[in-house]
Design a protein with these regions (language model features):
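Hydrophobic/aromatic-enriched cytosolic interaction surfaces used to assemble or bind macromolecules
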Residues: 1-302
Length: 302
C-alpha cells in the first residue's frame, strides 16, 4: 500500500491506498491548507516562493499521517507539457528513447531541451505510418525545486505526475471507453484531457469563468472548439463519453451544457464509484471530489 500526495496552490493532500479487485482501497487520508501565493505553477519560472514554509507544511502533514519514505506525487498541470510526437523510429532502450524524444520536442519547449524530463507512452501509428508517442514533459529545474522541498520534509519522491493524469489513473475504471474526454477544474484553471484506450492523448489547459456569476458558456464553447481542433489536426477519434469533475456548484450545469454542445453523453465523474465499499477513514472530507489526484498518485504503477 503506497502513499500519494497532491501539491496544489491552496492545499496539500496525502493518502495511502492500493487497488483491490479493480477498486481503490483507501486506508488513510489527511490534508493541510497552503498559504496563498506560496505555490504558483509554471513550466519555466520558479514555483515555490518560500520553500521553507512549504517544507514545514508537508513535514507536519506527513507526521500526522504517519507517512515516511517513498511517496508518489501529483503536481499542478501547468508544470507539464503534454504533446504527441511522431517519429519513424525510436531507440529500444527507454532512457535513450527519452533523450531522443527530448531532442525531437526541442522546438515545442519554452526552456532548453537539455533541462527537459520526459516520459512517454505509445499512441499507435498515424495515417502516414509513423509511430506516435504521447509525451509528458517538464522542466527538470522546476521538478528539482519540488523534489528538494519533499526531501527536506523527509520524504522520497518516487514519481512526479500531472494532476489530471493522476486523476485519470484513479478513475480509470470509470473512464474505460476507447476514446473519452474529461474536464476537471483546479481553482481558476480547468484541464480538458482526452484519453484513448485508457492512456492520455491530448490536453488543453483552460481558464474557468470568473466568480462574478459566469454561467460556464465560454468554458463550454472552448471545450467544444478544442475538441474540434483536436479532431482536425491530431486525427482524434470521436469520443464515446465525456466526464465533468470538480466544478463545484456548477458541475451539473456545465455537464448539461456540454451535452447540448457536444451531442454525446456527458456525466459527472463520481469518484466514490472507484472505491471499495465500507467506511472512509477519518480525516477525509465528506465527498471525494478533491481527492482524485492524490488517490491516482498512490496507485500509480512504478
Amino acid at each position: 500500500m503506497a502513499w500519494g500526495l497532491e501539491l496544489a496552490a491552496d492545499r496539500v493532500r496525502l493518502c495511502r491506498a492500493d487497488v483491490r479487485r479493480g477498486r481503490i482501497h483507501l486506508r488513510r487520508a489527511t490534508e493541510s491548507p497552503v498559504p496563498a501565493g506560496l505555490v504558483r505553477a509554471s513550466v519555466k519560472d520558479a514555483n515555490v516562493s518560500d520553500p521553507a514554509v512549504l517544507t514545514k507544511v508537508i513535514r507536519g502533514l506527513a507526521r500526522r499521517a504517519g507517512c515516511r519514505g517513498w511517496v508518489r506525487v501529483a503536481l499542478p498541470d501547468p508544470v507539464f507539457i503534454l504533446r504527441t510526437i511522431a517519429t519513424e523510429e525510436l531507440p529500444e532502450e527507454r532512457a535513450a528513447a527519452r533523450r531522443f524524444l527530448c531532442w525531437q520536442a526541442r522546438d515545442l519547449l519554452p526552456f532548453s531541451a537539455e533541462h527537459a524530463r520526459l516520459d512517454f507512452v505509445k499512441a499507435g501509428s498515424g495515417p502516414d505510418g509513423r509511430l506516435r508517442l504521447t509525451c509528458l514533459i517538464a522542466n527538470g529545474r522546476i521538478l528539482a525545486e519540488y523534489e528538494r522541498v519533499l526531501q527536506d520534509a523527509d520524504l522520497l519522491p518516487a514519481a512526479l505526475d500531472a494532476r489530471s493524469v493522476a486523476l485519470a489513473q484513479a478513475a480509470s475504471g470509470l473512464l474505460a471507453f476507447p476514446s473519452v474526454g474529461l474536464l476537471t477544474a483546479d481553482g481558476a484553471r480547468a484541464t480538458l484531457l482526452v484519453l484513448q484506450e485508457g492512456r492520455p492523448r491530448l490536453w488543453r489547459i483552460l481558464a474557468t469563468d470568473d466568480g462574478g456569476g459566469g454561467n460556464g458558456v465560454r468554458l463550454i464553447r472552448e471545450v467544444a472548439d478544442s475538441l474540434a481542433y483536436f479532431q482536425e489536426t491530431e486525427d482524434l477519434a470521436p469520443l464515446q463519453h465525456f466526464f465533468v469533475h470538480g466544478m463545484g456548484p456548477r458541475t451539473a450545469e456545465i455537464a448539461t451544457g456540454l451535452t447540448q454542445w457536444l451531442e454525446l453523453t456527458v456525466s459527472v465523474l463520481d469518484l466514490s464509484q472507484a472505491l471499495t465499499s465500507g467506511a472512509r477513514p477519518r480525516g477525509l472530507a465528506d465527498e471525494l471530489t478533491g481527492w482524485g489526484a492524490a488517490l491516482g498518485a498512490a496507485i500509480r504503477p512504478w
